Amino acid sequence: MLRSLFVDFNSYFASVEQQIKPHLRGKPVGVLPVMARGTCCIAASYEAKAYGIKTGTSVMDAKRLCPEIVFVEAQHAIYVEFHQRAVAAVERIAPVRQVLSIDEMECELTGSWRNRDKAMAIAHDIKREILSTVGSCLRCSIGIAPNTMLAKLASDMQKPDGLVVIEQAELPERLHPLKLQDVQGIGKRMLQRLQVAGIFSMAELCAAPRGVLHSVWGGVAGTEMHDMLRGQWYGPRNTTARSLGHSHVLPPELRNTEGALGVLMRLTQKAAMRLRKQGFYATAMSISVRCDHRYQATPGGGRDAQFGQMQDTGFFLDVLHKLWHSGLQEL
């Protein structure tokens, strides 16, 4: 049964830049956190990706790969504005159940919408609405599946401007060609734990008994993973949160000052989106960085900040830069 429709905008930051600056359309574009020679791309247009440029590619390497690339400095307030317009466009077609980040959102399919043909028609309507009311440069890939995790996987299977449906009857075999790291929640450490358990491929993950995955994940998350790979639906848990945040393990090419700051900016945006979506306000913000087996905690040294009730992404980004330049970037 199809229950989730996942919308993932393609090369979002770069696409917004091409939308507001027509002279960039059709050209390779790299989005930088700051206009500096020693920084790296936090986003790249599909024209740039064709040359091998991606998130984390340094300015120097990008120039070497594509001498005609155009660099622009990130404009986060504008990205937030376009995000709000995109959410409104999707909501005119189907109710948005949750916004997961600045370029991802999910709609829950109900009633007749769970029919494959109807779900695909809704997806096409969403694409048309975005192109006509948000911008012709804003393309998205849509995944449709029995649950959120599978719908997100489906949205990654065909880019750009893709539409992929995974049906219950196709599971779990449809997932076998994927990599383990394609599954949300399987990072470097979880991959190592899976390998210790003798699981090296997606086919082996899908074949693993529920008890094995319960042990690997160390709890109910493993049981849920087993079930979700087979199409089981898990709705959001009713919990009361006092804080929310995001973390990310930097790939080797981003393990530098500019790369870390660029990722922190993305994480801040994602957290701010969730904050507003859940109707909360923040009165404090903290950041922490783990460096080469050392951990720099947030208390002291200007790594946290208190303020009045806030929801604004721009405000949080200003706080982030103040915390970063207070000395955290020197770790």
Model-derived segments and spans:
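Gly/Gly-Pro- and Ser/Thr-rich, intrinsically disordered tail segments characteristic of DNA damage-repair
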Residues: 1-233, 273
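DNA-contacting surface of Y-family translesion DNA polymerases
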Residues: 6, 195-331
